[in-house]
């Protein structure tokens, strides 16, 4: 991926992008996905198998919307940690959580997906939503998520993917490559962040390759579910 100046790394570039759009991120996600993002997050959370009283981790949690879904499953006796490296996204996440019944069971932590600040076998599950494209090292991120999950627990990724259905694929890529950057520019008031979105998907591995990465990092029963015609894919693996 081309990193524009003055940024020196993908990590620095991604941090700047999400800092600039945190205030409009949730609204634009819902608008650009035609309100499907809520269903996608709920489906991904359900794949974790998180039970009432359980403990979950949401990596690259952003504004906390998937974190909230995990807290809903964990219930009043559970605990969920949302981790992100972007301060402004975490601030928005705290604001979002304060409007839910789950503020007492969610904690936000600033940290990096490739070096999670938790001991081995800490959580019952770990999720990452719409962020595996953005990390500097996909394999390391999956490996870190697996490390902090207890044996038998699930690692789940919800991510944009590459649809393959004829005709639908062409329509989708026209929308994604041309209209999303335009609508994003109108939504945030400046160019850049939503032009990054289609570029990030071009460089991202196909869903079958991500499944293989899950296997190579030691996750058992690695599988994936394509949703909404393959616009997004949920990958699931079990820690052994």
Residue ranges of each PLM-predicted region?
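Short glycine-dipeptide loop
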Residues: 52-53, 76-77, 149-154
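C-terminal alpha-helical "lid/dimerization" subdomain adjacent to the S-adenosyl-L-methionine
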Residues: 12-13, 158-213, 217, 223
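Hydrophobic beta-strand segment of the Class I
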Residues: 25, 126-127
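Class I SAM-dependent methyltransferase SAM/SAH-binding core
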Residues: 55-115
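A short acidic, Gly/Pro-enriched loop at the edge of an enzyme's catalytic core
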Residues: 114-125
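Core SAM-dependent methyltransferase catalytic element
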Residues: 217-240
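A short glycine-rich, Lys/Arg-flanked "PGG" loop and its adjoining helix->strand segment in the class I
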Residues: 139-151
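Conserved alpha-helix/loop element of class I SAM-dependent methyltransferases that forms part
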Residues: 34-54, 69
